C-alpha cells in the first residue's frame, strides 16, 4: 500500500484549506492538501465552463470581494500579490433598481449614500444618517472578535471591543435593538419610501430571511460595504486559489488533486492520518478538515466520533429555511448596457461595473415565503452583474459574461429541479433582461447550478455555500454547534477549517488561518 507521512494533512483544497496549509508550511510544518476535484479552489474558482464559449471566463460561485477587504490578513501575510493576485475596487458596488427604473446607489461613502436616499425622501436620508453610526458602532465592537479565535482569551481583542463599547455607550440600547430584532423590523421602523425600503431589503436579504428574529446582524453587510468597500479579483476568482497554491508550493507544501478522501483515520480517539479512495494512506499528526463539519465527522473512522457531536453537526442549520441561491452564467457575443437606467438618473453615473439588486420589498418577502413551500416566486429576487465590465480580460474583446444570482430559490422544488430547471432559467433571464439590455439577444451559451448541484459537485451539505446558516446561535464558539467551536474536538488531532467554523462564510481565509493557529498550538 502506498503510504507517505506529513505533519498535517488538509482535507479539501478550497481557499480555506490552502490558506491553512500556507500558514502551517510557513511555520515549518510538512503539509499536504488533498482535493477531490481536478483543480483547487472549491467555491473560489473560475474558468471556461460554457462549451460554446471557451474564451469566456465563468465564476461559478463567489465573485465580489467584501469579506476579504474586511479581513485582508491572508493577502498580506501570505504575500499573495507576489503570486499573481490583483484586485480592483468597485465604487459604486451595489445599485438597487426599482420596477419603474428608479435606482438607489450604495456608495462607499455613507454620507453620499444618504444624499442618494434624499432623492426619494429627505426624512429617510436623515434616518439613514442616524442609523449608520449605530451600525458602525456594532461593526467596531464585533470586528476584533471576528478576527481572533473564540477558544482563546484574546485580551487585546476584548479590550478593543470594550473600548468601542465605551465609546458608543450612549448607543447601547440602539445596538441591542438592532441586532436582536429582525432586519425587516428595523427597515420598516426607520424608513418610509418604497424605493429605500426595497433597496435595504434587497441588500440584506442576501444574508438570509430578513423577517427571522435577530437578523438585524445582517446590517453588518451595510457597514462592511461603507467601511471597507468592494473589490473584484482580476482574471477571475481562480487567481486567488492559484496564488495560494503557488505560495504553498514555494513554502514546500504538497497538493494532491483528483484524490477523494475516504476516511479520516482515528484510533483510540486520536487521528493518525487519512485514507484516500485510491487506496493510498497518508500519515499525519494532525488533520484539518476544510470541508463541511457534517462530512468531516462522518469521514472519521466508524465508532471513533462521539455520537452526540455527530448528531449536532448533522442537524446544524444549512439552508434550514428551505431555500438557497442558484447561479446562472451567460457567455455573450456583445456587451450589455444600462442606458435606460443611466438616462433616468441623469447624473452621468455609469452603472456598468456595478451589481444591480433586483427585487422590491414585497418580492424579497415573497421569494423567501415561496421557498418554504418548495415554489419559485413569479418575480425572482436577484443580484446581476457583468464581471467583464470590471475585467475585460474575462471575455473576447467587446464581449461580456453575465452573472445572475437569484438569492432565494427552493432547495427542493415540489416538481423537482429536473422538471423545472430550463423553465426557471428562462424566467430568471427574462426578468434580468428587463434591466440588463441585450442579455437575451447576445447569448452564446449558458450554465446553471442549483444547491443540489453544488452538493454533488463540491460535497457541500444541502448546497449551503456558507456551510452553516448565519445566526447569533451559530457564531463564535457556537459555530458549528455548542461544544464544537473550540480548539478541541472529540477526536484528538482533528481540526475543522472551513466556513462551518468562526467567523463563517466568505472569501477571506479566516477559518483556515484560525485552524492553522490551533494546529500550531497542538503540535510540538
What are these language model-derived features?
Residues 99-213:
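Rossmann-like flavin
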Residues 1-8, 26-27, 475-488, 524:
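Extreme N-terminal leader/targeting segments of oxidoreductases
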Residues 2-147:
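N-terminal glycine-rich phosphate/pyrophosphate-binding loop and immediately adjacent elements
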Residues 262-395:
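Mid-domain catalytic core of redox enzymes
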Residues 222-271:
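Helical element adjacent to the flavin cofactor pocket in flavoenzyme catalytic cores
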Residues 193-210, 374-385, 434, 438-502:
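A glycine-rich dinucleotide-binding beta-alpha-beta segment and adjacent secondary-structure elements
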Residues 499-520:
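A conserved FAD-binding loop/helix module that cradles the flavin
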Residues 266, 522-524:
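Active-site-proximal substrate-binding core of FAD-dependent oxidoreductases
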Amino acid at each position: 500500500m502506498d503510504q507517505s507521512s506529513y505533519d498535517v494533512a488538509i482535507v479539501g483544497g478550497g481557499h480555506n484549506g490552502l490558506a491553512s496549509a500556507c500558514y502551517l508550511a510557513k511555520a515549518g510544518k510538512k503539509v499536504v492538501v488533498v482535493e477531490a476535484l481536478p483543480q483547487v479552489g472549491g467555491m473560489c474558482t473560475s474558468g471556461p465552463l460554457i462549451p460554446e464559449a471557451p474564451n469566456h471566463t465563468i465564476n461559478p460561485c463567489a465573485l465580489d470581494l467584501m469579506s476579504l477587504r474586511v479581513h485582508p490578513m491572508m493577502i498580506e501575510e501570505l504575500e499573495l500579490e507576489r503570486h499573481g493576485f490583483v484586485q480592483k475596487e468597485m465604487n459604486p458596488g451595489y445599485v438597487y433598481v426599482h420596477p419603474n427604473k428608479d435606482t438607489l446607489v450604495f456608495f462607499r461613502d455613507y454620507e453620499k449614500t444618504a444624499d442618494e436616499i434624499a432623492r426619494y425622501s429627505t426624512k429617510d436620508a436623515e434616518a439613514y444618517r442616524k442609523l449608520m453610526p449605530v451600525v458602525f458602532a456594532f461593526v467596531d465592537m464585533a470586528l476584533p472578535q471576528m478576527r481572533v479565535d473564540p477558544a482563546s482569551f484574546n485580551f487585546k481583542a476584548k479590550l478593543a471591543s470594550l473600548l468601542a463599547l465605551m465609546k458608543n455607550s450612549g448607543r447601547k440600547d440602539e445596538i441591542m435593538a438592532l441586532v436582536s430584532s429582525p432586519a425587516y423590523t428595523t427597515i420598516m421602523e426607520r424608513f418610509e419610501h418604497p424605493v429605500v425600503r426595497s433597496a435595504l431589503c434587497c441588500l440584506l436579504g442576501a444574508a438570509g430571511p430578513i423577517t427571522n428574529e435577530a437578523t438585524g446582524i445582517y446590517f453588518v453587510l451595510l457597514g462592511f460595504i461603507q467601511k471597507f468597500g468592494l473589490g473584484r479579483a482580476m482574471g477571475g476568482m481562480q487567481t486567488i486559489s492559484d496564488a495560494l497554491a503557488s505560495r504553498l508550493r514555494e513554502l514546500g507544501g504538497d497538493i494532491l488533486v483528483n484524490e477523494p478522501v475516504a476516511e479520516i483515520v482515528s484510533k483510540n480517539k486520536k487521528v493518525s492520518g487519512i485514507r484516500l479512495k485510491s487506496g493510498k494512506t497518508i500519515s499525519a499528526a494532525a488533520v484539518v478538515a476544510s470541508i463541511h463539519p457534517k462530512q468531516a465527522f462522518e469521514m472519521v473512522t466508524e465508532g471513533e466520533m462521539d455520537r452526540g457531536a455527530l448528531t449536532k453537526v448533522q442537524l446544524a442549520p444549512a439552508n434550514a429555511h428551505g431555500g438557497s441561491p442558484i447561479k446562472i452564467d451567460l457567455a455573450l457575443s456583445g456587451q450589455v448596457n444600462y442606458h435606460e437606467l443611466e438616462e433616468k438618473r441623469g447624473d452621468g453615473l455609469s452603472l456598468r461595473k456595478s451589481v444591480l439588486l433586483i427585487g422590491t420589498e414585497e418580492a424579497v418577502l415573497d421569494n423567501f415565503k415561496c421557498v418554504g413551500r418548495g415554489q419559485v416566486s413569479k418575480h425572482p429576487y436577484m443580484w446581476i452583474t457583468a464581471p467583464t465590465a470590471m475585467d475585460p480580460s474575462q471575455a473576447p474583446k467587446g464581449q461580456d459574461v453575465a452573472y445572475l444570482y437569484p438569492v432565494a430559490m427552493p432547495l427542493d422544488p415540489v416538481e423537482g429541479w429536473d422538471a423545472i430547471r430550463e423553465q426557471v432559467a428562462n424566467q430568471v433571464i427574462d426578468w434580468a433582461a428587463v434591466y440588463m439590455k441585450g442579455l437575451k439577444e447576445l447569448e452564446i451559451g449558458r450554465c446553471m447550478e442549483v444547491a443540489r448541484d453544488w452538493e454533488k459537485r463540491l460535497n457541500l451539505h444541502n448546497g449551503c455555500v456558507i456551510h452553516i446558516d448565519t445566526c447569533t446561535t451559530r457564531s463564535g464558539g457556537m459555530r458549528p454547534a455548542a461544544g464544537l467551536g473550540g480548539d478541541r474536538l472529540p477526536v484528538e488531532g482533528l481540526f475543522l477549517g472551513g466556513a462551518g467554523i468562526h467567523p463563517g462564510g466568505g472569501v477571506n481565509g479566516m477559518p483556515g488561518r484560525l485552524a492553522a493557529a490551533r494546529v500550531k498550538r497542538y503540535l510540538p
